[in-house]
Amino acid sequence: MEAVLRTSSLVFLDRISYPDMEVRPGEIVFLRGPSGSGKSSFFRLLNGTVSPSRGTVLYRGRDILEIDPLLLRREVILAGQSAYLFPGTVRENFLQYHQYRDSDPPDSESMQACLDACRVPFSLDTPCDTLSGGEKQRVFLAIALSFRPAVFLLDEPTSALDGATAEALMANLTEYCRNHGVAALVVSHDRHLTEKFAERTVDLGGAAS
């Protein structure tokens, strides 16, 4: 199977070098590295939020610098550590994020399926200002998933969750990604989650394993 994402000789800010990497559809890859190794910056390089000093990122065989940034960021979705939700209901947040990215919004059934995948146990009409930090994080992940990305970049997706909820969420997300051919790249400081769910790990301080 062809790689959906491939990096070559990437350098950021002329000082952070990254290993070459290939990721295939449906593959679950966890990234490792100490603080300061540039894990979050690596994700921003992969979806074109920032540009490398040197090297290339290929998405489906094309240099991402040749791809419309809005289109790229709908297909290579970055769910960062900060989960921002607009005022209003969960449903309204789905609609606003899709409007913001100039994307056709999902129907209610599709929204609910994404909420279920992210273990969100309440309705689309729930006001977001009543949610806890962990609940907001899961809604934010569900919205990101609703764009049906080809590549899902997950930066500490369970940071606001307790251990049991974190494991259940990762079980759902990894199953969803495998079943739908979504390549998932995950940064997590939780060693248990890495050992349990990673099909492969990449050390940003060295070579892939």
Predicted feature residues:
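Conserved catalytic motifs of ABC-family nucleotide-binding domains
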Residues: 83-92, 101
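Conserved ABC ATPase signature
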Residues: 127-135
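Conserved ABC ATPase "signature" region
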Residues: 106-124
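Catalytic Walker B motif of ABC-type/P-loop ATPase nucleotide-binding domains
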Residues: 152-156
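Hydrophobic anchor residue at the start of the ABC signature
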Residues: 141-142
